[in-house]
C-alpha cells in the first residue's frame, strides 16, 4: 500500500477541461512515481489553485506547458522541498538526487508529449 502516481497522455482533442477528458479516446501512461510526496503535494496545490475542492486522491489533473515549467523551476531552485507534507501512505524518504532526477525526466518527457500534440494528465492513488 502507498502512494502511486503516474502521468498519461491523450490527444488534445480529447480534453474536456483541466479535470477530465473524453474517455472514448485512448490514454497511455508514460511516467510513474512511487511515494514521491513532493510531487503529490505540489500537484495538489495546483489542483486546489484551479478550483479543485475534493480530496486529491484518484483525481486527474491536466498539466499545461507552463505547469511543467513551474514544476521544473521549483525543483531546480529547491522550492519543491517545501512540499514535504507526509502522510501514512506517502512515505518519509528525504528529497534526494533520485527524486530530483525523476522530476526532471518527467518534465522532459511531458514536453515531448506536447510536441506530439498530446495533452498530459497527472493521476494518483493512495
Spans of features found by a protein language model:
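Acidic (Asp/Glu-rich) sequence patches and key acidic residues
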Residues: 1-126
Amino acid at each position: 500500500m502507498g502512494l502511486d502516481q503516474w502521468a498519461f497522455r491523450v490527444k488534445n482533442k480529447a480534453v474536456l477541461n483541466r479535470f477530465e477528458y473524453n474517455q472514448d479516446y485512448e490514454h497511455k501512461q508514460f511516467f510513474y512515481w512511487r511515494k514521491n510526496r513532493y510531487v503529490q503535494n505540489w500537484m495538489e496545490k495546483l489542483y486546489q489553485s484551479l478550483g479543485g475542492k475534493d480530496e486529491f486522491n484518484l483525481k486527474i489533473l491536466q498539466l499545461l506547458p507552463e505547469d511543467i515549467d513551474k514544476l521544473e523551476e521549483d525543483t531546480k531552485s529547491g522550492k519543491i522541498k517545501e512540499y514535504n507534507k507526509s502522510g501514512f501512505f506517502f512515505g518519509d524518504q528525504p528529497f534526494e538526487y533520485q527524486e530530483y532526477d525523476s522530476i526532471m525526466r518527467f518534465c522532459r518527457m511531458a514536453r515531448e508529449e506536447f510536441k506530439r500534440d498530446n495533452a498530459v494528465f497527472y493521476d494518483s492513488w493512495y
